[in-house]
Amino acid sequence: VDLLPELITPRSRILALGQMSNVTGGCPDLARAITFAHSAGMVVMVDGAQGAVHFPADVQQLDIDFYAFSGHKLYGPTGIGVLYGKSELLEAMSPWLGGGKMIHEVSFDGFTTQSAPWKLEAGTPNVAGVIGLSAALEWLADYDINQAESWSRSLATLAEDALAKRPGFRSFRCQDSSLLAFDFAGVHHSDMVTLLAEYGIALRAGQH
């Protein structure tokens, strides 16, 4: 975020950034980034796929233009996701596909579309996916996400402190993230994951 004033040029039109890194757990300062971008006349797109389940962004308070996340990251089905967009921006967008309920009126000269968001939803919707994601969101609503995130961070800290006592340990954890990425000098990550799996410890290895 500190580099944005140097990177933004008069040709810059859109700033796309992730809410949270799924490698280090790092989170950019969205408020600062959005302020920089908007002052330059840019539109901001935030990828919330990794962050939505940890700390949902307040799109109105942060003045986010577009915010997207996938359903399976919230314990919902695959093949479904959510795109939030400011109404004036959605209305200004042209449909990328035609057909189905997105059409308002048809004539020999062409067709007119429904208003947003329906004009952007051509064809048969993913009904099963929508129902599944809705059920997942209802289930999540019964839990305190902030409390769960705090608990996850404490577990990550506990693991990091314990592993730091071992020689060759190197942590890539960002700040106080609930995600802990690490390696050990001289030990291949695939070997480490395979060995730990025999003790009932499930980890993910390799580049991502």
Model-predicted segments: where are they?
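Pyridoxal 5′-phosphate
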Residues: 1-208
